[in-house]
Amino acid sequence: MSFGSEHYLCSASSYRKVFGDGSRLSARLSGPGASGSFRSQSLSRSNVASTAACSSASSLGLGLAYRRLPASDGLDLSQAAARTNEYKIIRTNEKEQLQGLNDRFAVFIEKVHQLETQNRALEAELAALRQRHAEPSRVGELFQRELRELRAQLEEASSARAQALLERDGLAEEVQRLRARCEEESRGREGAERALKAQQRDVDGATLARLDLEKKVESLLDELAFVRQVHDEEVAELLATLQASSQAAAEVDVAVAKPDLTSALREIRAQYESLAAKNLQSAEEWYKSKFANLNEQAARSTEAIRASREEIHEYRRQLQARTIEIEGLRGANESLERQILELEERHSAEVAGYQDSIGQLESDLRNTKSEMARHLREYQDLLNVKMALDIEIAAYRKLLEGEETRFSTSGLSISGLNPLPNPSYLLPPRILSSTTSKVSSAGLSLKKEEEEEEEEEEGASKEVTKKTSKVGESFEETLEETVVSTKKTEKSTIEEITTSSSQKM
């Protein structure tokens, strides 16, 4: 059995025997929880594992070939040296592959450190975002408190406005009442003026009547003087006539007729004088009564005029006071209406400002929510990448542990089968001694050794297969546990972030 046939048989069949179907392992590793990078490198890990398994199997085959070398009589030193060189080359390739795997492992560890640093930075940024998200809540509390204060001020202004409206309505009613009273007083004043005019006409009539009576009195006095003068003249004429008649009678009967004529004249004079006195007294009494009546009427008219003038003056004073009061109330009403308009404009401006502030805060809140959602998505992506890298690191760790276990078991089996420490130096004397000592019994011993070596090879391959299957099963179990734990951690982290963000909202 040559080295080339063993190598190619290992590359084709030992991979399926040890690790099973590579597509099944790759599909199992590239599950729904892993990322694209892990799926792209699952084939490389299976290829590396298959290469390492083939290398170990080929080294085992080399050991077995070295075990078979002493039994072959036709093997020369050149072939042994070539196989030794091939073995060295294979070992060198294996070392280079292990070095490359170690370098890749170091790169992945550095990448994990970088991702942990980024994770810490993102956690710090998330804490800052939470703090920033908590600050708008305090701003909202301040805004709500200020809004409550402004609402209280608005309610006070509304109550003051309602009170002012009530006062305005009361003042309007008072103005209406005063206006009605003013109109009533105006009507009373007009009636008093009309009465005054009527009284004035009566006074004028009384004055004219008094003047007429005075003229009548004067005419009566003149007539009385004229009557007295006429009476005196008539008396004088009668006296003269009486004297003439008395003289004529005296001549007839002076002694008898003289006393009777004197007494008759005396009686006539007394009658005329009493009649004139009665007429004069009656005229004076009528004049005095008329004059007293006219004076009384004039006094009453003067008193009524004075009272009317005083009442008119009082009405004018009250009207002026009510007019001044109405003007003051009108000015107060206008000032209150201006204040109400100013308060309404100020309230509208403040409400518009608060609406703008509310809109700005809502836009900031939406921006913060969108930014938080973006950071959550980035954090989710980073968690997915971290989970994939953790799975990949665990897979590489299990692969390295399995390779170390397999190399240790392979080294023990090779050392048990071939106890020589350095086959490159000890192989030629061993081959020479075996070829010189056992030339005669080469055929039978070669068959027996081949059968024994085949049995040992089958046992070693079965043992390696069992160990590799155990390593693969433990790797798959660890991988599934890592995926489940990572999903649980990610789900709990997302739920915690969502709960905290919803509570803060």
UniProtKB/Swiss-Prot annotation:
Q: What is this protein called?
A: Alpha-internexin
Post-translational modification here is noted as:
O-glycosylated.
One function term, GO molecular function aspect: protein-containing complex binding
Q: Give positions of region: Linker 2.
A: 239-262
Q: Where is this region: Coil 2?
A: 263-408
Positions carrying Phosphoserine:
S72, S219, S335, S474, S502
* Stretches for region Linker 1: 130-142
Domain IF rod, which positions? 94-407
